[in-house]
Amino acid sequence: MTKNNLFAMLAIACAAVLCSCNQQKGETITLQVKTQYGILEGLEEDGVKKFLGVPFAQAPVGELRWKAPQPVQAWEGVREAKQFGDDPMQLDVFGDMAFRGSGRSEDCLYLNIWTTAATTADALPVLIYFNGGGLMAGSGSEPRYDGSSIAKEGVIGVTANYREGVFGFFAHPDLTAASDYKGSGNYGFLDQVAAIKWVKENIAAFGGDPNKITIVGESAGSFSVSLLMCSPLSKNLIAGAMLSSGAEVLPYQPSSQADADATGAELLKQAGIASLTDAMALNADPLQKLLPPRGMANVVLDGYFMTESADAVFEKNEQAQVPLLAGWNSLEAHPMQAIQGQAPTLQNYKNALKAQFGDMTDEIFKAYGIETDEDVMNQKGFDLVSDLFTGFPTWKVCDYHAKSGLPVYRYHYMHPRPQQSEKMGDKVAALAGGVREKTAEEKKAQQPTIAPGAVHSADIEYAMGTLDTNEYYDWQDEDYAISKLFLTYYANFCKTGNPNGEGLPQWTAITKENLDAAPVMKIDVESKEVASPEKENAYRTLEKFYRSKK
């Protein structure tokens, strides 16, 4: 071999090494990121790159109202992504939810991205959070869902809006007949699918791994995630799922398309709207006032988003084959909500629920260990009404999933929010996380300033590391410590499908072998794992009741 040939081969080898290094290093992520639809320009704060108000579908306005989301159209030049898009149209159902969007509009299909990735080669895991609010309120712009803290843990945070209320969950015979898939009513859920697809197609440009997407939601968002785990449109797009207080399985039931259509037609009639054409012609605000939300919508078996109930999918083990982390709070509901102003005695509690439980009332109360007046207002009494609201269906998804041989990590969040700050004034916390003015009766009553447990939605700021965004409470060191633990569990789960990590309380997965005494992480000042055969028996007893009514 000549010297020139040797030098030539060395040069080729060096070039190959440099090329390999560049490929491993990946492209540097700046504040301008090229997506499949155009260039976005974000901003950076405290070491986190933010891309806000990113369109993931066409605006569902005009002829696109009450249609499945359509692919976003490409744009030319650089599109600024420095402020949140409009929040979904909604009435103030739950009080002030502290939105950061510029207003409320049907043009609301935007997502937000928080990343600390330096290059595209970082391939960070991704967390997509779907907000709660009964499918009729809430937004991805709410500060409590902010992705900055999870981004600092090495996970790309994403929030995504979806249509709510009448705009997201209205079915009608004419809409069904006109759609390509001969269905209607699941528009908000289809928006969530579109958001996941957009992230999967584009997140690599932000330093994310499209094959490591975990979805999470609280309350209505959690119900949504349980459905997204089952929908043929989304179940193969995700690598993990987290449920926080809710799932659309037993006792919640889907609607048939025919029933949903009939309900929609009757709603128009009751509102004095002569036809779907007339409804389409109404502006958004008068429309939502004429057709206000009536509680959380049932998913419709539209033959597209859902072809059968989530229970049926889980029973056949046809749900997403991914790790699951799920739980609920210790005070999702209060016995006084059932007793309705009467004395909190055992007999009054039984009387309040007898219309629901019938002949199984005594058996269910015994299973929950509610045997004295004192039990009504302690954790035993809290557990029963909390399970009737969100606890039982969340438990049932865990039960289904573990029986399928898939890893399940279950928690029970126990820690109450601290003393309210002076900012709360004459306001009171609302159900879904907002605040509202106290009623005249509430102003007269001596209400405790610290709840006896973790109320519905109280976990969000802790789990997402966003305590400081909520100025209505006087957060203490123990709150920040719990938040750090919860956030780390979330981040670890997104990274590995397992929440455990060095220095954390050990969290054992539920398996087919330990179902009768399932391990549960009690998240509190002193977090620890417990197993209670008695509690599992209580859930089985409640399941027996629900199945007897099907």
Role assignments for model-derived ranges:
Residues 132, 187, 191, 219-222:
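Active-site loop->helix "elbow" adjoining a glycine-rich segment at hydrolase catalytic centers
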Residues 97, 194-197, 201, 235, ...:
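Substrate-access "cap/lid" subdomains that shape
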Residues 206-218:
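Alpha/beta-hydrolase fold nucleophile elbow
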Residues 395, 399-550:
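Mobile gating loops/cap/lid regions near enzyme active sites that modulate substrate access
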Residues 222-234:
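Short glycine-enriched nucleophile-adjacent loop
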Residues 1-29:
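Bacterial Sec-dependent N-terminal signal peptides
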Residues 20-186, 210, 476-486, 496-506, ...:
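Non-catalytic accessory segments of hydrolases
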Residues 108, 181-204, 259-262:
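Alpha/beta-hydrolase active-site loop
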